[in-house]
């Protein structure tokens, strides 16, 4: 009976695998899925499986918990302004060391141990993420993206490698800047003309009632997003995520998925099964 169920699962996945073969998918990775070893393993397994079946994968990662841990070790306080990390010169050095060094290379190694091929990159490489200092309020070395150069990413994808990208940008003056991960993932997805953008979060998806997980909105049409803002359904940390989703959809990305990163194998459950999981945002009714 168990073997039949496994076979049925594989058969169910076949049309979805065929549909996604050769497509490019950008995954924003952060939150609990990065902190817990079991969840980290399941995400890496999902990415390697997707790569094996011919999907081009770009993994854009954060690392806030690791940055906080390192700052605490050197007695630097973690400060945030409107949800964005205040990044002075000393903090920026820690951010570079942790994101582009430890976290990025750990993820590349995890993918390798699962049998995949990966290359670790950051936004400084080949001037991949060009940015200006954030203008709205004083955040130190926090950048706003003005241009993304995906030549290096495309080269890695063509060679069959998963691109693992740390969200550090560079300015015209050569200064390095901390970049919001959701914003970076959206900008990279746009420039690659990706088929999908997937955001792993610490909630089931977009919720109608913030404290009620059963109020999950499973599907949103792009033209209805403004109404959700007006109704106060999109609030707090979900605001920059949804803004990034809208920007991606308006600039060539076909679909955006907001998934619960606390659920093991949430990515392949969403992409390769009939039931799916999380919130799908798309351009129009089908």
From Swiss-Prot:
**Pathway of action:** Amino-acid biosynthesis; L-arginine biosynthesis; N(2)-acetyl-L-ornithine from L-glutamate: step 2/4
Family (UniProt): Belongs to the acetylglutamate kinase family. ArgB subfamily.
Q: What are the BP-aspect GO terms?
A: arginine biosynthetic process via ornithine; L-arginine biosynthetic process
The record's Gene Ontology cellular component field reads: cytoplasm
Give UniProt keywords alphabetically: Amino-acid biosynthesis, Arginine biosynthesis, ATP-binding, Cytoplasm, Kinase, Nucleotide-binding, Transferase
HAMAP family recorded for this chain?
Answer: ArgB
Output one GO MF annotation: acetylglutamate kinase activity
Organism of origin is: Clostridioides difficile (strain 630) (Peptoclostridium difficile)
Site Transition state stabilizer: list residues.
28, 241
UniProt-listed Enzyme Commission number(s): 2.7.2.8
| Localization (cell) | Cytoplasm
Residues annotated to bind substrate: 63-64, 85, 178
| Segments crossing the lipid bilayer | none
Q: What name does UniProt use for this protein?
A: Acetylglutamate kinase
| Record-linked InterPro entries | AceGlu_kinase-like_sf, AcgluKinase_fam, ArgB, Asp/Glu/Uridylate_kinase, Glu/AcGlu_kinase, NAGK-C
Gene3D superfamilies in the record, alphabetically?
A: Acetylglutamate kinase-like
Q: Which Pfam families match?
A: AA_kinase (PF00696)
Q: Superkingdom of this entry's organism? A: Bacteria
Provide the primary localization: cytoplasm
């Amino acid at each position: 009976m168990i073997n039949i169920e496994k076979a049925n699962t594989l058969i169910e996945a076949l049309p979805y695998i065929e549909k996604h073969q050769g497509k490019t998918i950008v995954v924003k990775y952060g939150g609990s899925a990065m902190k817990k070893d079991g969840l980290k393993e399941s995400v890496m397994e999902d990415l390697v499986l997707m790569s094996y079946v011919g999907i081009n994968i770009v993994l854009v990662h954060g690392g806030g918990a690791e940055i906080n841990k390192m700052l605490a070790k050197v007695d630097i306080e973690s400060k945030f302004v409107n949800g964005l990390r205040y990044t002075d010169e000393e903090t920026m050095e820690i951010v570079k060391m942790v994101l582009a060094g430890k976290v990025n290379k750990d993820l590349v190694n995890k993918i390798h141990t699962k049998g995949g091929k990966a290359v670790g990159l950051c936004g400084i490489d080949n001037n991949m993420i060009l940015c200006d200092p954030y203008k709205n309020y004083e955040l130190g070395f926090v950048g706003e993206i003005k241009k993304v150069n995906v030549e290096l990413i495309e080269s890695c994808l063509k060679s069959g490698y998963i691109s693992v990208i740390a969200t550090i940008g560079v300015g015209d003056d050569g200064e390095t800047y901390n970049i919001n991960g959701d914003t970076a993932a959206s900008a990279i997805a746009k420039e690659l003309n990706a088929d999908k953008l997937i955001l792993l979060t610490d909630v089931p998806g977009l919720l109608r009632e913030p404290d009620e997980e059963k109020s999950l909105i499973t599907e949103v049409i792009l033209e209805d997003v403004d109404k959700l803002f007006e109704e106060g359904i999109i609030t707090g940390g979900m605001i920059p995520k949804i803004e990034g989703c809208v920007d991606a959809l308006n600039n060539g990305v076909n679909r955006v998925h907001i998934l619960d990163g606390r659920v093991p194998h949430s990515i392949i459950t969403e992409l390769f099964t009939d039931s799916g999981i999380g919130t799908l945002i798309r351009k129009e009714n089908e």
